[in-house]
Amino acid sequence: MLDIKAVLFDCDGLMFETELISQQIWKDEARKLGFTLPEDFFINITGSGGEELNRYLSSIPNGMDLYKVMKKKRFDISFWSSIQKDCLNKKGLITLFYWLKQHGYRIGICSSSYRTYVEALLSTVSTPLEYDAIVGGDMVTHAKPDPEIFLVGAKILDVQPAECLVLEDSKQGIIAARRAGMHSCFIEDTIQPDHTMKEMIEYQTENLEEVIQLLR
C-alpha cells in the first residue's frame, strides 16, 4: 500500500478524451499550411508547454506558424465548453474523484494548459468534481518535463512530494513526476511508452478507476 496523501491529475488525455480531437486539429491545420507533421510530433508535444514546446516547434519548418494558429483553435474555450455533458469523461473519472474525497485524499489538477481551459473541460462533467487546487501552465514558469508544476501543486496542498501520486498519460509528465520526487502512475491514451518512459514509469493502470486498487 502506498503512503499517499495527495493525488495530482494531468488533464488532457488523462481526465478527458481530448487528445484525439486535438491531434486531428493539429493535422488539419498543418495540412492547410502545406506540410505533414513528423511521426514523433505528438510524443514530443503531449504534456509539454512553454520553452520546451517552443524549442521543439522551432525545430520544425512552419512549426511556429502552426502554433500561432493552434493557440486559438486548440484552446477555444467556447468550443470545449459547448461539448455534451460527460462526452469527454475518461473511464472511471467520476468514480475515482468521489472515492478519493470519501477517503480523505487531497486532489490537485496540474495541467500544462491554461487554467481557464481546464475549467472549461471541468464544466462538461455533469457531476461537479471536488478538488483542492488547479495549477495551470499559465501559473508556472517552467513547463513539464520540469517538475515545477507538480511541486507547486504539492505546496498548495501542503504535502511533501513523496506523499504525492501523479497520474499521467504523457512522457513529459512522467519525467516531471520523477524529477519532482513523486510516485507516478501511467495511464495510456494516445502515447505508447518509449524506452525512456518505461524506465521511469512506477505504476501503470488501464484506466482511472483501477487507480483505487493502488491506494487500497
Labelled PLM ranges:
Residues 1-5, 98-101, 114-216:
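Asp-based, Mg2+/Mn2+-dependent phosphohydrolase catalytic module
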Residues 14-15, 84-85, 107, 138-139, ...:
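A generic structural signal for short
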Residues 2-99, 103, 128:
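N-terminal helical cap/lid subdomain that shapes the substrate entry/recognition surface
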Residues 32, 43-44, 83, 108, ...:
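Short, flexible active-site loop motifs that bind/organize anionic cofactors or intermediates
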Residues 58, 79-80, 105, 136-139, ...:
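A broad detector of the eukaryotic-type serine/threonine protein kinase catalytic domain
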